[in-house]
């Protein structure tokens, strides 16, 4: 099961105790996942389609609880395409679809029916209603990426005016959502992990929030470990290359002018370096008598390198 599906299943279980919040959520669900069918003069059917049984059950409960509408859930099987089943709820004109759509702020009756694309201000007067509306919009047309891959939460609609209105609502709560056109749709999206976490929290996706944060922590730890390993690998490679170069310098001196021609302090470090090629500068310094520090060893080896460089130029 995808992270997006898990999140939707969790949010589908959230039922507000306030009627106003339920109506706001149902309005968003219908705007995002519903369609209106004209079946006669001033007669409409409302069709709500979803791929998740949990969302279908939630719509069924909200219709029954807040509007006393008893509808049925039918299942469309997609056997040939091997895709998920889709669940369809139909509210007919006889059931009161026109009354429902008016109360949801979707339909206006002015010498004929007109659909309202903007979010009705009457539906989102209270903070809880705003959160419920966003939750409904996500359940109706939203998705969220697996945090293992990237951070992306979006709300898809085919209506530009509704997309603008939804973006304004989300941003009124302190977020920075944006809109992008995708084929024939308009997508309201958020990409920052912190903002996605906060939005999940206010719409009731607490388990999804914890899962996202845990995944983020693991990713950051993994990245830190990789950085440390890469850094240590680079340092080790640098140390090995330096040791190889130092030994080559000493062998060149040995084959040309002889190590005995070097000052006594350089002879001492040269003999130890060529005998113990794998030792660190610190370990080399501890073998000298008297012992010297890492910087002292490095200074002597640089002197040897200068002599070897001069010999190369002369040859």
From Swiss-Prot:
UniProt key word Cell cycle: yes
Annotated Gene3D superfamilies: Homing endonucleases
Source organism superkingdom: Bacteria
Organism of this sequence: Clostridioides difficile (strain 630)
Name this protein carries in UniProt: Probable cell division protein WhiA
InterPro entries: Homing_endonucl (IPR027434), Intein_endonuc_central (IPR004042), Sporu_reg_WhiA_N_dom (IPR018478), Sporulation_regulator_WhiA (IPR003802), Sporulation_regulator_WhiA_C (IPR023054), WhiA_LAGLIDADG_dom (IPR039518)
Record PROSITE patterns: INTEIN_ENDONUCLEASE
Signal peptide: none
PANTHER family: CELL DIVISION PROTEIN WHIA-RELATED
GO biological process, one term: cell division
Residue ranges of DNA binding: 280-313
Family: Belongs to the WhiA family.
GO molecular function terms listed in the Swiss-Prot or TrEMBL record: DNA binding; endonuclease activity
UniProt function note: Involved in cell division and chromosome segregation.
NCBIfam families, A to Z: DNA_bind_WhiA
Protein keywords: Cell cycle, Cell division, DNA-binding
């Amino acid at each position: 099961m995808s992270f997006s599906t898990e999140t939707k299943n969790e949010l589908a279980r959230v039922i507000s105790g306030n009627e106003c919040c339920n109506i706001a959520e149902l309005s968003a669900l219908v705007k995002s996942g519903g369609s209106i069918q004209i079946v006669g003069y001033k007669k409409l059917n409302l069709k709500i389609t979803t791929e998740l049984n949990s969302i279908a059950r939630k719509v069924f409960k909200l219709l029954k609880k807040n509007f006393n509408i008893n509808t049925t859930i039918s299942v469309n099987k997609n056997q040939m395409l091997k895709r998920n089943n889709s669940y369809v709820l139909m509210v007919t004109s006889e059931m009161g679809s026109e009354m429902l759509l008016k109360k949801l702020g979707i339909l206006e009756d002015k010498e004929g029916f007109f659909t309202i694309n903007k979010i009705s201000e009457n539906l989102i007067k209270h903070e809880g209603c705003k959160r419920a509306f966003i939750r409904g919009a996500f359940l109706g047309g939203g998705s969220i990426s697996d945090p293992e891959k990237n951070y992306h939460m979006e709300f898809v609609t085919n209506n530009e005016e509704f997309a603008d209105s939804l973006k304004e609502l989300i941003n009124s709560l302190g977020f920075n959502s944006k809109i992008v056109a995708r084929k024939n749709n308009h997508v309201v999206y958020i990409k920052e992990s912190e903002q996605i976490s906060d939005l999940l929290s206010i719409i009731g996706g607490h388990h999804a929030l914890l899962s996202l944060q845990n995944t983020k922590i693991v990713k950051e730890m993994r990245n830190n470990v990789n950085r440390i390993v890469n850094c240590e690998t680079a340092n080790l490679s640098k140390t090995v290359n330096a040791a190889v170069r130092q030994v080559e310098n000493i062998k060149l001196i040995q084959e040309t002018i002889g190590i005995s021609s070097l000052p006594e302090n350089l002879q001492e470090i040269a003999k130890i370096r060529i005998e113990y090629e794998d030792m660190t500068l610190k370990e080399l310094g501890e073998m000298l008598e008297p012992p010297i520090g890492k910087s002292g060893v490095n200074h002597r080896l640089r002197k040897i390198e200068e002599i070897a460089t001069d010999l190369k130029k002369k040859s």
